[in-house]
Amino acid sequence: MVMWWPCSHREPGDNGLTTERYARQLLHWGEENQQRISQATVLIAGVGGLGAMVSQLLVRAGVGRLYLVDDGIIDWPDLNRQVLYGEKDIGCGKLQLASERLCAINSATEIFLIEGRIDEDFVMPTDLNAVADCLDNYQSRFLLDELTPQGVFFVHGGLHGDHGQVLTLQSGKSQPLANIFAGACQPKGDIPVTPDNVVIVAGLMVNELFATLFGEPKLLNRCLVISLIDFHISFLDV
């Protein structure tokens, strides 16, 4: 099911670019790249730990349109890392709350809600510039990558305890995610996650999403792996 959450207050012809609001980032990447962000459409699969932070950062930066995909309910263990939710939200659906809070941050972003899982029946939007893989299981990740439209950038993020990884693929020009992580096994039980690692990996994902929108991906077919144990960073070509 796809729903449009009508939080956008843009006037016709307004691209959401306001010098005052985006003044600090305009000093860094300029108006041309800000225009690219304001005209971009990004799908975020999963609005839990990574997805909540990735979506918030994109909205704050002025992204034009977001598709949010999830079907989860907020529970107590979510609150250590899922920044869009609080104690009063326990038992509520993530998707609706995420859209309301993101709209409160930036009403110029159009938000479309897709309530459901990434499965064989999932229908991928066709107007995408990038996909952010913020899921928590490999089978759904593999399918999401498989469904990504030709030429669209796919930014994968994952974490486990003190470790995190970010990788960019381009549909039709990269090998499938399923081939890269062919030997990966889904951990049994709950995955250890700390809030600091979520913020770091989400920040790296958003940095790479910006790079793809600017036409200069830094991690295309290249996996960045970070360890917070000793702040070691390595790169693996895939």
Q: How should each PLM-predicted stretch be described?
A:
Residues 91-128, 134-138:
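A structured beta-alpha segment of the ubiquitous adenosine-cofactor-binding alpha/beta core
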Residues 1-43, 177-179:
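N-terminal charged helix/coil linker that caps or initiates catalytic domains
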Residues 50:
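Hydrophobic/small residue at the entry helix of a nucleotide-binding pocket
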Residues 68-105:
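Glycine-rich phosphate-binding loop and adjoining beta1-alpha1-beta2 segment
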Residues 2-13, 118-238:
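Glycine-rich phosphate/adenylate-binding loop
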Residues 60-65:
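Conserved S-adenosyl-L-methionine
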Residues 44-47, 68:
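Hydrophobic Val/Ile/Leu positions in short beta-strands of Rossmann-like dinucleotide-binding domains
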